[in-house]
Design a protein with these regions (language model features):
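Structural signature of FAD isoalloxazine-binding scaffolds in flavoprotein oxidoreductases
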Residues: 69, 155-172, 188, 329-338
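N-terminal export signals
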Residues: 1, 7-30
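A generic local secondary-structure boundary/capping motif
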Residues: 43-47, 56, 127-129, 149-152, ...
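Residue-level recognition of short, solvent-exposed, well-ordered loop/turn junctions
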Residues: 132, 139, 187-189, 302, ...
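Catalytic-pocket segment enriched in acidic/His residues
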Residues: 177, 222-348
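Non-heme Fe(II) oxygenase catalytic core, chiefly the N-lobe of the double-stranded beta-helix
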Residues: 167, 171-226, 230
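N-terminal non-catalytic cap/leader segment that marks the start of a structured domain
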Residues: 5-6, 10-12, 30-159, 332-334
Length: 348
């Protein structure tokens, strides 16, 4: 599988011209400036490889399909594969597993005219979560200094890990149906998502980022009264954070070569247009590389596994109790991570 993936990366130079069109700041519907993903670059192997592209999951009348960003449009890879009569990855998960790579090469190398019908404008596209069936969704608690301070939590001596399940996945422009019979205190947490690209076990901090396929914008949505139903001394991370739809992620899975240093990214949350969180990943207590090295010392990480790296200050939980106005049905949440794009969802 790894040999196939390396071959594809070497041969991917045929898409360099198309890749240079990816993710311009003027891309419709995805914001500008710091929230807009960067243009494609030439990969370390001398070609615009898979980690130098931005991928997504499209929801179409024919079913979900792998998508590839091309400036202000998205290429429906599945539809393009049918037009060229080749087998391609059906999802980002299959892309990460190395499936359908020969057909994908042909789609990427095809003249623009032959796949024109497979292009859809970004503003007309419907998106699913940018990963669909990770084996593991690993979350981090209290991993930003100022967030730990606002919640009066001592800095952890090791990464605080917990998990979510696939039922929590939610796509861009999705709707979270709040479990109001069980909880009332709903909160936002913008987080940089790390998507693994290679199997990792006991990897070093120095090598850790080489196992990453890409990054995404996500939100560790939380029900605080479930999380702390037994008091702050007995946090119930799982039940407070793993209800249906409680991990919006995407729309873009942005290749690691486009993002560069994951410790220099602006992160923001807006609620109904009001900025609530505005920070930078340089405030992390444990870096992405340290998190991967630590997690891989405990269990094997596989392609497609998600690591959500913690949230910065500005959450409702961190405010004085008299100022805590919890989220409610009808609220509109916008999250952004620099170079990864903007994620939007609504509460119902």
């Amino acid at each position: 599988m790894e040999t196939t993936r390396r071959t594809l990366l070497r041969n991917a130079g045929v898409v360099a011209a198309a890749g240079s069109m990816l993710f311009q700041a003027s891309a419709a519907g995805q914001g500008t400036g710091s929230s807009a993903p960067a243009p494609a670059t030439t990969g370390k192997d001398g070609a615009a490889g898979l980690r130098s592209q931005a991928w997504c999951m499209l929801r179409t009348p024919q079913g979900d399909s792998l998508g590839l960003r091309r400036e202000n449009r998205v290429l429906d890879v599945g539809k393009a594969g049918k037009a060229l009569k080749v087998q391609v990855p059906a999802s980002t998960d299959e892309l990460l597993e190395g499936k359908g790579t020969a057909g994908l090469q042909k789609v990427l190398a095809a003249p623009a005219s032959s796949v024109k019908a497979a292009l859809v404008a970004v503003e007309d596209a419907r998106f699913g979560p940018c990963v669909t069936r990770p084996q593991k969704i690993i979350m981090l608690g209290f991993n930003y200094r100022r967030h730990a301070e606002e919640t009066h939590t001592p800095f952890p001596k090791a990464p605080v890990l917990f998990n979510k399940y696939n039922n929590a996945l939610c796509g861009h422009e999705g709707v979270i149906h709040l479990p109001t019979r069980a909880a009332k205190k709903f909160d936002y947490e913008v987080e940089l998502q790390v998507i693994m690209g290679k199997t990792a076990r006991d990897v070093s901090e120095t090598d850790a980022l080489g196992y990453v396929f890409g990054y995404a914008t996500g939100n560790d949505f939380s029900a605080r009264d479930l999380q702390y139903r037994d008091g702050k001394g007995a946090s119930q991370f799982m039940i407070g954070k793993t209800c249906d739809g409680f991990l919006p992620i995407g729309p873009w899975l942005v290749g690691a070569d486009l993002v560069g240093d994951p410790q220099k990214l602006k992160v923001e949350t807006r609620v109904n247009g009001e900025t609530r969180q505005s920070s930078n990943t340089d405030d992390m207590i444990f870096t992405c590389a340290q998190i991967i090295a630590y997690a891989s010392s405990l269990f094997t990480l596989y392609p497609g596994d998600v690591i959500s790296t913690g949230t910065p200050e500005g959450v409702i939980l961190g405010k004085p109790e008299a100022q805590q106005v919890w989220l409610k049905p009808g609220d509109r949440i916008e999250c952004s991570v620099e170079k990864c794009g903007e994620l939007r969802f609504t509460l119902a």
